[in-house]
Amino acid sequence: MNLEKYILAVITTNPNKVSGGTASFICETKEEMEFVAGNLEAILDGIAHGLGEEMYVIVKH
């Protein structure tokens, strides 16, 4: 089995929305969350997707 799509990281302002399984980053503000998501997108060579107002996921396609 070859995984082609997977979640690299989760970035959120609401720690109650995250459980284990991948790298999680808890931010204090929406602006900080967007900044962290943008940087992780570049660092991890992934794509950031917003899931509502409180969460981004970085995925590898």
Cite the ranges covered by each PLM segment:
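N-terminal non-globular leader segments, chiefly Sec-dependent signal peptides
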Residues: 1-46
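Short, compact, well-ordered microdomains
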Residues: 44-61
